[in-house]
Amino acid sequence: MVNLKLGKYGVWAKKYLEEYKPFKFSRLVMDGSVMDYLLEFEYHLKGYANLVEFELKQKFPVPSENENFVEQVNYIYMIQEMVDEFVKDEIKLV
């Protein structure tokens, strides 16, 4: 199965290809290069996500250690949700 080695972003890219670019996905499957393509694109997406996360954390500083635990967890979830939205836009370049 193709999804065994793919992470979250690779799976998202695969679903996007299947749904919005079926001809390209079929060609990659027939060539036998779909897994290599998705792994390479996932590598790109992970780098992009790390860059976006770094920039978001600069723009929205981490709550201080004195803040309660719930605030710190909410901050982490907020950053991750924002990163995921940026990555979903980037997947359209697949």
Describe each PLM feature range.
Residues 1-94:
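Extended, charged helical/alpha-beta scaffold domains that provide interaction surfaces
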